[in-house]
A protein has these predicted regions:
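A cross-kingdom feature that marks ATP-driven nucleic-acid transaction machinery
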Residues: 63-231
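Conserved helicase/translocase motor-coupling segment
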Residues: 1-73, 79
Length: 231
């Protein structure tokens, strides 16, 4: 049913409305690529390279961007741009794309590629949008020492910077935090924000919510989804 919905409603409508009947196969391939990369940083240029190297199809990045806009205009997907938290400015490319309906995404891939961490991230993004938040991908920077002893500027990511009115919440999506090393990796970007806005990590491996000694709210995924006032 969902696959039929894709072909008969979404794709057919995009093709007819934008008069690109001869490009339907390209649209199909683009949709497959986006379906396979939810929650991953990408841009039209990288996608065009994927067309060339993997699909052996030559297409320019401007055309890819235009077709992605068709998907966005049809409410099939949406994009989250990268935001420099301390610099208070948008970075631009690359960015992330999420499906408005995860079931449609899964059907598109014939229910393969069921990466639970990426699907969970998509679900959290959608729920934040439904609750009226504007959502960006947060970026913070630090100077870190590499294995050679040299220091360099390193970008760290906060999955979501959710803003509604005067409220701002930093959110990490973590399928599981099995050890302290993984927990520290997820928490580090929070410490780099340099502000006191609420910080939340949504996890699949816990049920009850609790605050750690850093003041970060740990919350179970189900708890977050069932309580619209959870953040």
């Amino acid at each position: 049913y969902l696959q039929n919905l894709f072909d008969k409603i979404y794709i057919s409508d995009i093709v007819e409305r934008n008069k690109i009947l001869h490009e339907k196969s390209v649209l199909d391939e683009l949709l497959n690529i986006i379906s396979s990369s939810i929650g991953s940083l990408t841009n039209p240029s990288n996608i065009a390279k994927t067309f060339h190297s993997v699909r052996q199809i030559d297409i320019d990045s401007a055309t890819v961007a235009r077709y992605l806009d068709f998907f966005i205009d049809s409410f099939m997907i949406s994009k989250a741009e990268r935001y420099d938290v301390k610099g208070r400015k948008y970075i631009g490319s690359p960015l992330k794309y999420y499906f408005s309906d995860v079931g449609l995404r899964n059907a598109r891939l014939n229910f393969r590629q069921q990466e639970e961490n990426h699907i969970m991230e998509n679900i959290i993004y959608n729920e934040l949008i439904v609750r009226g938040f504007s959502v960006d991908v947060g970026v913070v920077y630090s100077r870190e020492q590499n294995s050679s002893g040299n220091y360099s500027k390193v970008a760290r990511e906060i999955d979501f910077v959710a803003v509604k009115g005067g409220r701002k919440v930093y959110i990490q999506s973590a399928f599981a935090l099995p050890d302290e090393e993984k927990a520290a990796q997820e928490m580090k970007p929070f410490a780099l924000t340099g502000d006191s806005f609420p910080k939340v990590i949504i996890r699949k491996d816990i049920r009850k919510r609790w605050y750690d000694d850093r003041g970060v709210l740990n919350m179970g995924l189900i708890d977050f989804l069932l309580d619209e006032n959870s953040i």
